[in-house]
């Protein structure tokens, strides 16, 4: 018994749902008929709806309306509204694919989800640029001043890519300047006057990587400084007095006479 009562309740609920859908369809069909006629008063809307629902024994008005719907069905805007929406969506997606290329392949699903979550209202269509700027961060902003949106979008992408290249160039230049500063600190002013080619710079970097701090500039040893302080300019004058290769023969002849005169004092 309990199962039978439960089944009856389910049937009543299902029947009420079907009745509501039938009533909605009947009212919509009768509205289409009255819209199609030149004089909407020729068909009684209430009588047509009741005949469609089966609450009146006569079906004269409903039969007339049904014939009219079958003849002029493609002309009704309600029938074509779904097709129009689908075609408009396809056209929009095709245009976006043309404008932004692979960008829509990568982020198209995200933008479609955003459109489904936040649909644009009719009163917001006039301010479409502001809505797109808020939604997509200004990247998909429409330019209302110029008509060629494709050219504008391509210019925008070129500017974005150009800024990326400029940033990469700036970072590369900054790294090169930092390397130059390090080289100038390490080698003093010796490397400033040299204008090297990129190939020489690469070779210098390889040498630096290979030998590390071995190539750093090293000062004179302490014993050389003490030696220089002790003997002063005597060594310079002695080096200047040494003969060249051309004067070697004459000097070899004069050496015995000097040794006879000064003995072993001039030996070094």
From Swiss-Prot:
GO terms for biological process: aggressive behavior; behavioral fear response; cellular response to cAMP; cellular response to oxidative stress; cellular response to transforming growth factor beta stimulus; cellular response to virus; cellular response to vitamin D; G protein-coupled opioid receptor signaling pathway. GO terms for molecular function: opioid peptide activity; receptor ligand activity. Its main location: cytoplasm. Spermatogenic and somatic cells. Residues 163-184 are annotated as: Disordered. Pfam families: Opiods_neuropep. It comes from the Eukaryota. Proenkephalin-A is cleaved by CTSL to generate Met-enkephalin. One of its GO terms (cellular component) is dendrite. It is found in: Cytoplasmic vesicle, Secretory vesicle, Chromaffin granule lumen; Secreted. This is Proenkephalin-A. It comes from Mus musculus (Mouse). The gene is Penk.
